[in-house]
A protein has these predicted regions:
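Short, solvent-exposed loop/turn and secondary-structure capping segments
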Residues: 5, 10-13, 48, 55-61, ...
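Short loop/turn segments that connect beta-strands within beta-propeller blades
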Residues: 12-15, 94-98, 144-148, 195-198, ...
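Predominantly five- to eight-bladed beta-propeller fold
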Residues: 19-37, 47-103, 292-308, 360-371
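Structural motif
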Residues: 4-8, 54-60, 87-89, 135-142, ...
């Protein structure tokens, strides 16, 4: 437990001795973390020691506190870009001998984050993950519980940035092997790493497509089940498919081959799954499948939208056009109002969110996509677009955002809207507006500041 910023141990039986300090150097500004992780054999403890930084503070006003009539002022630490950040380092205690085992933590100072990720089952050591500030290096380290030596199991580096939000790690055989997600070949794929040497044993998936999410790992069968997108060249590259592959990279299967965005629900034993697939222009279909087989066992339900159509509802249109380089496909969706009349001229509004952490245009069927369809009902053609600089395409596509957030994919977005207007004459590109929330609000302001020859209002 932690008391006065230091680590103490004591018997659960109060009659068996006094508390013993394992550390004595903890202070208010340089303290030991309360997350104390015991080794499985109960002989060691791992935790973090954190050195606080002199941080800016911002005031927050609670207008109607329960404790008093007057508003209440609170202060919160709030670092700004470029400020010094807190630094955490791993710490190892030997409980049997009531001492701290020294670790060489030089090299981990300039950090965005450092977190402990648990002990090995045999108590030989524990692991941590280190994200260097600037996101150009990401390390998985292992601390030897006997001598405190640190070795790097994964040392991921990038000349631009590592998309750490997409990191995936799965330790096999108590860390003898590691399954790891990386964009090191230009696309987000899975690798098998030797847990002793840190060397790549083999690349598990490869190709001009991306692994989106690992669903589960069957260690016994040495098989991985995951969602992937971009598999089929003639399909929207953001559509997700449920796939599987062996650890050695053989036996790849797309278990959900329909041209759509798939969501799966597994049975408890994972031998069957419900596949619900749709697109913005395809109502949902729910089918039952058996794991490892492409064929459909039963169609469970098909969405009937005849009543929607009878009311004049307009199906959103998935649209693709070339981006700024004249080569790269840019994908988005067009929304039209219920009373749409192709003989009229309509102003265009882009609903934007260009945050680089993800892609943002919905790929599912949604008859009332409130942020777009509601605006369309006011008499606009509304568009949503994933331009360069957003996630879930190639690393090159994503890297456009690096040190360049103001770009927000605008050269691609403008090309896309112009291409749509050439096809649909009712889209009036002399009247283009834009709006968004959060990062989308920043993007909307950037549109007026840097591209006001095209965007007229925000």
């Amino acid at each position: 437990y932690i008391r006065d910023n230091n680590v103490y141990i004591a018997s659960s039986d109060k009659n068996q001795g006094e508390e013993v300090p394992l550390s004595i150097d903890g202070t208010f500004d340089c303290f030991y973390d309360a997350n104390l992780i015991w080794s499985p054999d109960s002989k060691k403890i791992a935790t973090l020691k954190t050195r606080q930084a002199n941080c800016r503070r911002i005031p927050l006003l609670e207008s109607a506190p329960k404790t008093q009539l007057q508003p209440l002022l609170h202060w919160r630490n709030y670092a700004k870009p470029g400020d010094v950040l807190p630094v955490s380092v791993p710490v190892l205690f030997d409980v049997e001998h009531c001492k701290q085992i020294p670790l060489d933590t030089r090299g981990y100072e300039n950090q965005f984050s450092l977190s402990l990720t648990g002990w090995r089952e045999d108590s030989r050591g524990f692991t941590f993950e280190f994200n260097r500030r600037g996101h150009q290096q990401y390390i998985v380290g292992e601390v030897n519980a006997q001598n405190g030596m640190i070795r790097h199991l994964v040392d991921e580096k990038s000349d631009t940035f590592i998309s750490y939000i997409n990191n995936y790690r799965y330790d096999l055989n108590d860390g003898m092997e590691i399954l790891w997600m990386s964009e090191r070949d230009g696309w987000r794929h899975l690798y098998r790493i030797d847990g002793k040497t840190g060397e790549v044993k083999n690349q598990i998936t490869r190709g001009e497509w991306v692994v989106r999410k690992v669903i589960f790992v069957d260690a016994g069968q040495q098989r991985i089940y995951f969602m992937a997108s971009g598999l089929n060249k003639k399909e929207d590259p953001y559509n997700q498919h449920y796939c599987c592959v062996n650890f050695d990279g053989t036996g790849f299967q797309d278990l959900t081959p329909e041209n759509a965005n798939h969501k799966v629900i597994l049975s408890k034993d994972r031998s069957y799954f419900v596949d619900v697939y749709s697109r913005p222009d395809l109502p949902p279909v729910s089918v039952l499948r058996k794991l490892g087989e492409k064929k459909v066992i039963a169609t469970l339900e098909k969405c009937d939208i005849s009543d929607l159509k009878a009311q004049g509802w307009q199906m959103p249109e998935v649209f693709c056009a070339k981006g700024r380089d004249g080569k790269t496909d840019i994908w988005g969706t067009i929304y039209r109002p219920f009373n749409f009349d192709p003989s009229k001229s309509y102003p265009v509004v882009e609903n934007i969110y260009a945050g680089p952490h993800d892609s943002h245009v919905s790929k599912d069927f949604n008859p009332i996509e409130w942020s777009s369809s509601s605006l369309a009902e006011l008499g606009y053609i509304v568009v949503r677009i994933d331009g360069m600089g957003t996630n879930n395409r190639s690393k090159k596509f994503h890297d456009v955002c690096w040190k360049n957030l103001k770009d927000a994919g605008f050269p691609d977005r403008i090309k896309w809207i112009q291409a749509a207007a050439r096809k649909y004459k009712y889209m009036d590109t002399s009247r283009v507006g834009i709006y968004g929330w959060s990062a989308g609000g920043q993007n909307a302001m950037a549109a007026l500041l840097f591209h006001n020859d095209f965007y007229k209002a925000a």
